[in-house]
Design a protein with these regions (language model features):
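Long, contiguous binding/interaction regions
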Residues: 1-11, 15, 19-51, 56-162
Length: 162
C-alpha cells in the first residue's frame, strides 16, 4: 500500500497509446473535472507504442470512479488501475546540487554522488515518497543550491510464492 499519501490522494496507473496529444488529453480531462494533479510520471511501457502514466490526484474513492469512467472514454487509454490500496513498489528520485561540505552526511543517508566539485556537488537519492520527502527536508536544512524531484513511479508487487 502507498503509505505516504493521504486519504484524498489516489494513485492511478494508466496504460496509453503513444501520441503527441495523449498527455494533454488525459490531464485536460482531469483538470476539467476540477481535480488537482499532484504528480505525473510518464515513460515507455514494456509494449512498443505504449506508455505508462502514473498519476497522483487529489480525489476520494467515489471521485476516482468518475475520473476512471471519463478516462475510459479516451481512445488512447487502454487500461486504468487504481493502485492506492494495493501492495506496490513505489519510488521517487531527487537530484540536487549541494554544498560540497555536506556531501559526506548525505552519502551516509543513501545519496549517491553524480558530479563532484570543490564548491558544490550534484547528488541523487531514490526511495519511497516518505523517504524522499525527509531527504528533501534535510536538503532544505543544509541550504541546498538546487533540487529537482520526480513524481512517483509505481508498480504492483507480484504475488509472493511461499
Amino acid at each position: 500500500m502507498i503509505q505516504e499519501t493521504s486519504e484524498r490522494v489516489r494513485v492511478l496507473s494508466v496504460l496509453v497509446e503513444d501520441g503527441s496529444s495523449t498527455l494533454t488529453k488525459v490531464t485536460g480531462m482531469i483538470r476539467r473535472r476540477g481535480f488537482h494533479v499532484r504528480a505525473i510520471t510518464v515513460g515507455p511501457s514494456g509494449e512498443p507504442g505504449r506508455s505508462r502514466m502514473t498519476l497522483q490526484i487529489d480525489a476520494g474513492h467515489a471521485e476516482v470512479d468518475q475520473v476512471r469512467k471519463q478516462l475510459e472514454r479516451l481512445v488512447e487509454v487502454l487500461e486504468i488501475e487504481d493502485l492506492t490500496e494495493h501492495d506496490v513498489h513505489s519510488r521517487e528520485l531527487v537530484v540536487a546540487r549541494v554544498a560540497a561540505s555536506v556531501v559526506p552526511e548525505l552519502v551516509a543517508k543513501g545519496a549517491r554522488v553524480l558530479e563532484p566539485g570543490s564548491v558544490s556537488t550534484t547528488i541523487e537519492f531514490a526511495g519511497e515518497g516518505e523517504e524522499v520527502g525527509a531527504f528533501v527536508e534535510d536538503l532544505r536544512r543544509h541550504g541546498n543550491l538546487d533540487v529537482v524531484r520526480s513524481g512517483p513511479v509505481v508498480m504492483r508487487r507480484t504475488a509472493r510464492i511461499q
